[in-house]
Swiss-Prot record:
The keyword Protein biosynthesis does not apply. Belongs to the STIG1 family. This is Stigma-specific STIG1-like protein 3. Keywords: Signal. InterPro entries: Stig-like (IPR006969). It comes from Arabidopsis thaliana. Residues 1-23 form the signal peptide. It comes from the Eukaryota.
């Protein structure tokens, strides 16, 4: 009879512990949901017609803030963004650097393959190219091989 009472006591204790755990999880879930709802309601974005001082100042100077998005109208916009030997060009109405842009490598719409990278206007495999080993313009020494982007990988 003593053994039976012990088993019943253990089962009763376990069932009470499970009920308390379920109640705690249920209450904390409800609190989390209400906190989320109140946080979402207070985070509504209020927009005004006012422009910041910085943007207003640039607009007053006559500078077109979206000039790079409209380079077909003025070809020289792209050239002015780079230096003297600039490789900037206007492709698909955007200013791009033909030396390092993977979608316009060397010429407009010349897209590099999936594992290739545009270096100096040509598509190369950084993992195996001796002139661009691991990164653009990182050359391996004479007699070394580029393997997995490392010179003389052993």
């Amino acid at each position: 009879m003593g053994h039976r009472n012990t088993v019943l006591t253990i089962l009763l204790t376990i069932s009470i512990a499970i009920m308390v755990l379920i109640a705690t999880v249920f209450v904390s879930n409800n609190k989390t949901e209400t906190l989320l709802q109140t946080h979402t309601q207070t985070q509504t974005l209020i927009t005004t017609g006012r422009v910041s001082r910085f943007l207003a100042q640039n607009a007053k100077n006559g500078r077109n803030l979206n000039a790079a998005d409209h380079c077909n109208k003025e070809e020289e916009i792209c050239k002015s963004q780079g230096m003297y030997n600039s490789t900037m060009a206007c492709c698909s109405n955007k200013c791009v650097d033909l030396a390092y842009d993977n979608d316009n490598c060397g010429a407009c719409k010349n897209q590099c393959k999936f594992t290739q990278t545009c270096c100096r206007g040509e598509c190369v495999y950084l993992a195996y190219d001796k002139r661009h080993c691991g990164e653009c313009n990182h050359s391996c020494l004479v007699g070394e091989f580029c393997v997995y982007g490392l010179c003389n990988y052993a």
